[in-house]
A protein has these predicted regions:
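N-terminal intrinsically disordered, low-complexity tails of helicases
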Residues: 1-35
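Helicase motor core with emphasis on the C-terminal RecA-like subdomain
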Residues: 2-9, 34-35, 41-47, 51-131, ...
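Short linear motifs in intrinsically disordered
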Residues: 88, 209, 344, 463-475, ...
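Flexible hinge/switch segments at interdomain interfaces of large molecular machines
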Residues: 221-223, 387-388, 469-477, 575-577
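Short, compositionally biased strand/turn segments
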Residues: 299-301, 305, 472-497
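C-terminal effector modules of nucleic-acid-centric enzymes and ribosome-associated factors
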Residues: 374-386, 390-438, 485-692
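Accessory beta->alpha helical hairpin/"wing" motif in late/C-terminal subdomains of nucleic-acid enzymes
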Residues: 446-467, 521-530, 615-617
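Short, amphipathic alpha-helical interaction segments positioned at domain boundaries
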Residues: 459-486, 533-539
């Protein structure tokens, strides 16, 4: 006890400026703060991994702010860049930090698409922003960033191995290049920066952080809150009615329910608005709603003592929505990380997390069983192998040319930005040259006499659409604004027009379309109608990862191999004049299953009639014995199927602006040919063993 007291006192003494502002109201440091603050004070780059609401934000800020306050002169430049994945999280952080930083006489501001423009002549000491707004700042106000001393990346696992994560890697390279240039001109005296990344759930944090900055020290504190999980079969609306009706006996007042799609959020909110303990305190939160509408829902939900909110992944992250008594999951998310993120939103001020997992089929039940077991064991599964997405090259070149002094760039110099921290290129030079040639042919760029690139007509169109700084939205997605007839306010966006007179669900309420003008749908509130349905809203679909598919197969009791190397088949005899049907239990996910089917068709002249994440249904006889194929045969299957699979992976909004060869190569990289070969090479096809 005395040792811990002495440790706390010593740490407090090391923070003479920031203790009172950031920690005094808590009275003590949390474990992650005890472990993280000393190395950060010493100037080390760190990645902090600990549970939600454990104090990671203060652990990162205190040492960085302390370094600023050590200088007695007022600091008038932007010093700390804090990068978050969502605008809502940025707003939440600035609300939390405004008062503490006022005590330190330091200004904090938010820079996102929702906020007013920054005054470049009077920047804050701390800027909270998203990758997209960071990109815009680099392109339009690069000099404002030359004095940055530290970069913090919040929710690192949300970014990594996604288009936005790849974008962030290149943005940091651009920032480092900018600072080297400023140093060479004598504008700054030191181009060094300190880095800190934060995450609650991440596998191999050192390797992940090393993609963004050098020499990361891992500061990891184990210990998730205890999990009380209940699995409930969701048969109908009555199931949730019964669940919510008994909440009073559980002393549950505030519930956050995660759905798998925006349409489900709308439908469930409409169904639950009457006859539940929540009355009219039923809210909806998803990406198709306008930012102001979402913000209103966040505020109302946080301030309500009794409330229910249906949300998609938009509320997965750690914005303050008050103390949630119960998390309800309607359908299983696609991976463990999303499951942990969602359940982490509940009971943040207690030692236990309560969650009800509602499954609609046996696969969802198996997924929940796997996720709950992993969460209770504190396990974090490995993510899919990392690959760099070439579509980011298109977006970053379009942004980088805006940053250059004369509005033109040297493609060879720009290529150096697309490299890891050791200078190894992230894509082949041949592919890069193809991209440059393709973008020039498509008039994104024109070429000067000295082989420099200048913006072309297609670039100008992107710029007018304010689309050159983001990888978030599909370029082909055309939306229609939903406008409230009475107030004139935008409620959100839909992707297909609703005919005047039609009734639909939006924002948890029934709306009637009154008229449709160009890209604007005018609506009024409508009386609840049982036939009202949500508008068609597209949702991304992702294939199940091979390791997760294997775990699902084992949980469901699918035929298992007698030996680890066996690939189990079940052959069903058909009528004499028909070929047999062979069920191939690959248990490796949809993507691997699809290409395995291509390989089997090539090897055995059979026909695949159906496939999913666990099995193939093959018309014809698949012989037992070694499964022998080549990587060339796998690539041949990918060449036939790449277009079908392109939308399965997160490849970035500029994927279709790549030359065909590079598009195919990026699908192949996402598919992970080496992983496929490792999974199936040397496997032996064997009939399932039947129980005696």
């Amino acid at each position: 006890m005395n040792d811990k007291y002495a440790q706390q006192r010593l740490l407090k003494e090391q923070l003479p400026h920031t203790w009172d502002a950031l920690f005094a109201r808590f009275g003590r440091f949390t474990e992650i703060q005890v472990q993280a603050i000393p190395p950060l004070l010493d100037g080390h780059n760190c990645v902090l991994v600990s549970a939600t609401a454990s104090g990671k934000t203060e652990a990162a800020f205190a040492p960085l702010l302390e370094a600023l306050k050590e200088n007695s002169k007022p600091f008038r430049q932007l010093a700390i860049l804090y990068i978050v994945p969502t605008r809502a999280l940025a707003r939440d952080l600035v609300r939390r930090l405004q008062q503490p930083l006022e005590k330190l006489a330091l200004r904090v501001q938010v820079k996102t698409g929702d906020e007013a423009a920054l005054n470049a002549a009077r920047p804050p000491a701390l800027l909270i922003t998203t990758p997209e707004s960071f990109d815009s700042l680099l392109a339009n106000h690069p000099r404002m960033l030359k004095d940055i001393r530290a970069v913090v990346i919040d929710e690192l696992h949300i970014f990594d191995n996604t288009p936005r994560g790849d974008q962030l890697r290149i943005l940091l390279n651009r920032l480092r290049r900018l600072k080297r240039y400023a140093l060479s001109r004598g504008d700054i005296t030191n181009d060094a920066m300190q880095y800190c990344a934060l995450s609650a759930t991440i596998h191999d944090p050192a390797a992940v952080a090393a993609r963004y900055f050098n020499d990361p020290r891992v500061i990891q504190v184990s210990g998730q809150r205890a999990l009380d999980a209940e699995l409930l079969e969701l048969e109908s609306v009555v199931t949730l009615d019964s669940l919510f009706a008994e909440l009073k006996t559980r002393d549950v007042k505030k519930v956050l329910a995660f759905c798998q799609s925006r349409a489900e959020c709308e439908q469930w909110a409409f169904e639950m608005r009457d006859g539940t303990p929540f009355g009219d305190r039923v809210f909806v939160h998803h990406a198709s709603l306008d930012a102001k509408v979402r913000r209103h829902a966040e505020t109302q939900f946080a301030q309500s003592e009794v409330a229910l909110c249906f949300a998609t992944s938009t509320l997965e992250l750690g914005i303050d929505i008050g103390d949630v008594d119960l998390i309800v999951l309607i359908g299983a998310p696609g991976n463990l990380s999303a499951f942990l993120q969602r359940i982490g939103r509940g009971n943040r001020r207690t030692a236990r997390t309560a969650v009800v997992c509602c499954y609609r089929n046996e696969t969802e039940r198996a997924l929940f069983q796997i996720f709950v077991a992993a969460a209770q064991a504190g396990a974090i599964t490995a993510s899919q192998p990392y690959f760099f997405r070439p579509s980011i090259v298109v977006q970053q070149l379009c942004s980088y040319v805006k940053q250059t002094t004369y509005g033109e760039l040297d493609p060879d110099s720009a290529f150096e930005l697309f490299a890891d921290l050791h200078g190894t290129p992230l894509l082949a030079k041949a592919h890069y040259d193809q991209i440059i040639e393709h973008l020039t042919a498509k008039n994104y760029f024109t070429t000067t006499d000295s082989r420099l690139l200048k913006p072309g007509a297609a670039w100008s169109e992107l710029f007018e659409q304010r689309a050159i700084y983001t990888n978030l939205v599909d370029l082909t997605r055309v939306t229609i604004d939903v406008i409230d007839e009475e107030t004139g306010r935008k409620l959100g966006e839909v992707e297909r027009a609703i005919k005047p007179g039609g009734t639909f669900l939006f924002g948890g309420h029934a709306r009637q379309a009154t008229r449709l003008t160009w890209r604007k749908l005018i609506v009024r509130s409508a009386a609840p109608a049982r036939e009202a349905r949500p508008p068609q809203l597209r949702s991304a679909w992702r294939p199940m990862a091979p390791a997760l598919a294997q775990a699902v197969a084992e949980t469901l009791g699918a035929p298992q191999p007698q030996h680890p190397a066996d690939l189990v088949i079940v052959t069903e005899a058909e009528a004499e004049d028909e070929s047999p049907v062979t069920w191939v239990f690959h248990c490796a996910g949809d993507a691997y299953g699809l290409i395995l089917g291509e390989v089997l068709e090539t090897l055995y002249h059979v026909r695949v009639e159906d496939y999913n994440d666990l099995y193939l249904a093959v018309k014809g006889l698949v012989p037992t014995g070694p499964l022998e194929f080549t990587a060339v045969q796998v690539q041949s299957g990918l060449r036939r199927r790449w277009k079908q699979m392109e939308s399965w992976f997160e490849l970035g909004r500029f994927q279709e602006q790549l030359p065909l060869d590079v598009r195919r190569a990026s699908v192949s990289a996402a598919f992970d040919v080496a992983g496929f070969v490792q999974t199936f090479q040397q496997r032996r096809i064997a009939e399932a063993v039947t129980a005696e």
